[in-house]
Swiss-Prot record:
The lineage of its organism: Bacteria, Pseudomonadati, Pseudomonadota, Gammaproteobacteria, Lysobacterales. InterPro entries: SurE, SurE-like_Pase/nucleotidase, SurE-like_sf. This is 5'-nucleotidase SurE. The gene is surE. It comes from Xanthomonas axonopodis pv. citri (strain 306). Its main location: cytoplasm. Keywords: Cytoplasm, Hydrolase, Metal-binding, Nucleotide-binding. Binds 1 divalent metal cation per subunit. Its cofactor is a divalent metal cation. One of its GO terms (molecular function) is metal ion binding. Its EC number is 3.1.3.5. A divalent metal cation binds at D8, D9, S40, N92.
Amino acid sequence: MRVLVSNDDGVDAPGIQVLAEALRHAGHEVMVVAPDRDRSGASNSLTLDVPIRTRRIDAQTCAVAGTPTDCVHLALTGMLDYDPDIVVSGINNSANLGDDVIYSGTVSAAMEGRFLGLPAVAVSLVTHNHQAHNYDTAARAAVEIVARLKADPLPADTILNVNVPDLAWSDVLGFEVTRLGNRHRSEPCVPQRDPRGHTVYWIGPAGPEQDAGAGTDFHAVRTGHISITPIHVDLTRYQALDTVAGWVGGLTAALDGPA
């Protein structure tokens, strides 16, 4: 298959290089289109206020001065001279568990691929303090999952979010299909003083696990399993539709009131 590979850690990150090489070794034609620097936390943002510059590193690698979503969007809307068959994003150098997927550039790159009509997988290595040791395990998991997707495709609105414990392949206990867990609210932001005496802020750490019991992605990884979570983008809160519908009469009446 023709595989488009992207990430949010940047085109030079070790995770994307290991992933691309593993996919090539499995017989796939791989094109890497990734940010020219770390764009972690970029979520689904597109660059609309300035033109986006690109730089060909070699015939199979392109660096983009933009977000992960920019990378996939450009690659699938005319920048390449062929159409890929699948998007694989990663390997991220940290977890994308539970609420993380809302902010994750790794997941968003896969999501953009799905929006533009391709099957998509996001792969993350759940490291401690961003010190990764087993990218090869995550890459092997990605290769196996891509093979299954080719043989048994998923519905067109589905993205696979894969989280891999930082273990040797022989130490992984298995694969688990999971749902997204949840974290507590984020830790406080971190204020500092710059050299001119002005207060600046760093975003604080993600909150600790909250909904992380059996069946969640958190639990699977914590117990030595590779978590596969099928996700889709429909933010409708169906349970609230009837309640909000009950407001409509009053809201409509307000239209007849004084301006």
